[in-house]
């Protein structure tokens, strides 16, 4: 994940994205049954986000891990999750629940390119009331 050259660096010398990659690696290395991921890809650049998100997605599927993913990214929620829960503004309440039915054996790019992905994205966008 581009960290090899920084093996002897202090954490203060790492970028936010590097620290986030270290945190993800450390979490996955412990092989937990449940992953609690709070904005795990937010500090990553677009290309790195896609690569690491795809890697984590494959690991989670292969090892049958349960994941609770907190994200502000509709895209991440749809391509990564089996279920998306949309919350209202404060005080947070469940606004809608989506059972995501995309091909589980596909990679995240294939999931993103499906027609169903676009339908989910548009529905979730409407739930967020951001157009008003």
Question: What are these regions, as identified by a protein language model?
Answer:
Residues 64-70:
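Conserved H-loop
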Residues 35-38:
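Catalytic Walker B motif of ABC-type/P-loop ATPase nucleotide-binding domains
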Residues 24:
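Hydrophobic anchor residue at the start of the ABC signature
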Residues 79-86:
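Conserved catalytic segment of ABC-fold P-loop ATPases
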Residues 9-12, 30:
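Conserved signature/switch motifs of ABC ATPase nucleotide-binding domains
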Residues 1-6, 58:
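Conserved ABC ATPase "signature" region
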Residues 49-63:
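Helical segment within the ABC ATPase nucleotide-binding domain
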């Amino acid at each position: 994940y581009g960290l090899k050259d920084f093996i002897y660096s202090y954490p203060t010398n790492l970028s936010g994205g590097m620290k986030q990659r270290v945190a993800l690696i450390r979490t996955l290395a412990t092989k937990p049954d449940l992953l609690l991921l709070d904005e795990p890809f937010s500090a990553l650049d677009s290309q790195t986000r896609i690569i690491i998100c795809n890697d984590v997605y494959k690991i989670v599927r292969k090892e049958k891990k349960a994941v609770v993913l907190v994200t502000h990214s509709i895209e991440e929620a749809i391509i990564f999750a089996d279920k998306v829960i949309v919350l209202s503004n404060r005080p947070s309440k469940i606004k809608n629940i989506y059972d995501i039915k995309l091909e589980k054996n596909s990679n995240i790019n294939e999931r993103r390119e499906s027609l169903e992905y676009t339908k989910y994205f548009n529905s979730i966008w409407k739930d967020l009331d951001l157009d008003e």
